[in-house]
Amino acid sequence: MPRVKRGVTARARHKKVLALAKGFRGRRGNVFRIAKQAVMKAGQYAYRDRRTKKRVFRQLWIARINAAARELGLTYSQFANGLKKASIEIDRKMLADLAVHDKAAFGSIVEQVKAKLAA
């Protein structure tokens, strides 16, 4: 059986890891052993934060809706209850966008909600 020399595959593997570590500071970007650890850790952070991002954006949308609703005399929970009673099925992302960029449209939704809550 011939002897297997791994120069080509090792070089390719090193190049791949160092390419992923491009832009890292210090030896994390140019020493394979350290770059490999840094790339692994970066992947763990990326995996974790793709899930965290969903929670963070939901919190942001709720905070924006709450602030806009309070300006018009309702709390977030009252507003959410009124939306359900009025059968308005707009998600939080769209409501937050309306609250920030189209105050008139958000105001009309709040008026519909207030009417349903009063009835």
Swiss-Prot record:
Q: Which superkingdom, per the lineage?
A: Bacteria
**Protein's UniProt name:** Large ribosomal subunit protein bL20
For this entry, list what GO says about its biological process: ribosomal large subunit assembly; translation
Family to which the UniProt record says this protein belongs:
Belongs to the bacterial ribosomal protein bL20 family.
Annotated Gene Ontology cellular component terms: ribonucleoprotein complex; ribosome
The keyword Ribonucleoprotein appears for this protein: yes
The record ties this protein, via PANTHER family, to: 39S RIBOSOMAL PROTEIN L20 (PTHR10986)
InterPro entries documented for this protein: Ribosomal_bL20 (IPR005813), RIBOSOMAL_L20_CS (IPR049946), Ribosomal_protein_bL20_C (IPR035566)
Entry keywords, A to Z: Ribonucleoprotein, Ribosomal protein, RNA-binding, rRNA-binding
**By its UniProt entry, which Pfam families does this protein fall under?**
Ribosomal_L20
Q: What is the lineage of its organism?
A: Bacteria, Pseudomonadati, Pseudomonadota, Betaproteobacteria, Burkholderiales
Cite the GO molecular-function annotations of the record. Answer: rRNA binding; structural constituent of ribosome
What's its job?
Binds directly to 23S ribosomal RNA and is necessary for the in vitro assembly process of the 50S ribosomal subunit. It is not involved in the protein synthesizing functions of that subunit.
Q: Which HAMAP family match?
A: Ribosomal_bL20
